[in-house]
């Protein structure tokens, strides 16, 4: 394997947010090829599923819609408050709150992408665009690459994102790739949408990208057109009201949203003790269990309990409002 560059959490337990970057030789190799890792887990996917109450796998359309309406309603109220107050002291507060709600809206669209929002596929895709287009996420492009991530979680060779890279890969990376991945990791999501992760080819916006199958290209094009239209609207706002206005009311909340997305996904897939597998050492359940649950305190309810990540990775069709119950149910099985 050789030495790896790994973004890792340093501190006591999984609640620490102090991030460092370090070369890990023996440690990373140990995590990838730890003795005994080839052995099967003492429980199966069926064992885990059997522990979860059946209703946890059922989505409720009206309940799902209530979260969608709540997020859009709060976003609208914050815009109204910002316009009414219109004081310099309020805008930093507005940026943090609104950016957090943009992130919450992304999570609702995330449920649409997994099919856990409702049992109606076309409705899921329509509402997924309603959630993701305003925050410049190409819904289908993201949905399909995210599917790849879930199908390969914990596989160092095929996972879509947040995987450690070898020292050789590190030295072969362009300077801007090193800058983005190891120094600006909380701001790289827009770049990832255009370029993917280091060593991966393609773009979430381009239908002919190797990310997508031929029959998916029209869907990807639809999402790209939606994002282009959104950019046109934002450009028109900037031209009419001024670029400072656009930055103040959209650009800064969008930046906070990007930080939330990168921070949360980083924390769910990075820890000093997380193993990475390759080849026959990997299989789906082992990979899914290499994710990490995180507690975000009062933000848990705002961003729809996305911190319950292990249960989500094992069963992507569980709606976010059932993940807490599902997590509690599987703990005795997982040990």
Language model: regions and residue ranges:
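Acidic (Asp/Glu-rich) catalytic motifs at the cytosolic membrane interface
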Residues: 102-121, 142-155, 264, 268-271, ...
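Non-catalytic, topology-defining segments of multipass membrane proteins
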Residues: 2-99, 132-252, 321-335
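Juxtamembrane helix-capping/reentrant segments at transmembrane boundaries
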Residues: 117-136, 159-177, 278-295
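Transmembrane alpha-helical segments that form the membrane-embedded catalytic/substrate-channel core
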Residues: 99-109, 138-141, 186-201, 250-278, ...
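Juxtamembrane/interfacial segments around transmembrane helices
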Residues: 125, 173-181, 230, 271-284, ...
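C-terminal, well-structured subdomains that either form a transmembrane helix-short loop-helix hairpin
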Residues: 300-333
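Multipass alpha-helical transmembrane domains of eukaryotic endomembrane proteins
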Residues: 204-220, 266, 270-298
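Residue-level signal for cytosolic alpha-helical hairpin/rod architecture
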Residues: 127-128, 187, 307-311
